[in-house]
C-alpha cells in the first residue's frame, strides 16, 4: 500500500477530543492532501456531524489503513490485519470516550470480523485495549452513502444513537 501512496494519512482534528471517528482508507484526494475525508465524502461527513451538533474540528478522525489502496480498491484481509495493531495502538494513544467505525474495513480492523455492516450498524459494542473499555458503534461510511443514498436513513438513526450516547456519558462537545 505504501508504495502506491503519495502520503501517509494519519489523522486530523482534536487529539484530545472525546470522539474518535475511524474510516476505512484514504482515497485519491485524501492521499493528495494528506488529510482524511476530503471532497464530497468530507462534505457529507461534515453535514452528518453538524446534523447532531458536532463540529468536525472537535473530534479526532483517522483511518483503519493510513495508505491508499491501489485504484481505491477495498483493502485485502492481510492488509487490514497488518494495520490492525497499529490502529489499536492509535486508539490507546488518543484515548477517546467514544469510537465510531465507518465502513467494513474499519470494523474488520478493530473486531477482526467479517460481519455485514447492515447487521451490526447502530449497535453499541465494546473493545478492551490496555485494560480500558471503549464503547464503539459501527455505521456506513460516507463514501458508501454517496454510492447508495437510500442507506442514509439508517445512518441518520445511527447518528441519533450517537447523540444519545454523548448525552448519557455527559460528554461536552
Regions found by a protein language model. Give the residues of each.
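A polyanion-binding, active-site-adjacent surface
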Residues: 1-173
Amino acid at each position: 500500500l505504501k508504495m502506491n501512496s503519495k502520503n501517509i494519512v494519519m489523522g486530523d482534528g482534536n487529539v484530545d477530543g472525546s470522539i474518535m471517528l475511524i474510516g476505512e482508507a484514504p482515497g485519491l484526494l485524501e492521499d493528495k492532501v494528506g488529510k482524511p475525508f476530503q471532497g464530497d465524502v468530507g462534505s457529507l461527513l461534515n453535514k452528518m456531524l453538524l446534523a447532531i451538533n458536532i463540529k468536525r474540528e472537535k473530534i479526532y478522525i483517522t483511518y483503519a489503513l493510513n495508505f491508499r489502496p491501489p485504484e481505491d480498491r477495498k483493502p485485502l484481509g492481510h492488509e487490514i490485519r497488518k494495520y490492525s495493531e497499529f490502529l489499536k495502538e492509535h486508539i490507546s494513544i488518543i484515548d477517546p470516550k467514544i469510537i465510531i467505525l465507518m465502513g467494513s474495513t474499519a470494523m474488520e480492523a478493530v473486531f477482526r470480523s467479517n460481519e455485514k455492516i447492515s447487521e451490526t450498524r447502530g449497535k453499541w459494542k465494546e473493545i478492551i485495549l490496555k485494560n480500558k473499555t471503549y464503547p464503539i458503534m459501527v455505521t456506513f461510511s460516507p463514501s458508501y452513502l454517496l454510492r447508495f443514498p437510500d442507506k442514509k436513513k439508517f445512518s441518520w438513526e445511527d447518528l441519533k444513537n450517537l447523540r444519545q450516547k454523548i448525552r448519557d456519558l455527559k460528554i461536552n462537545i
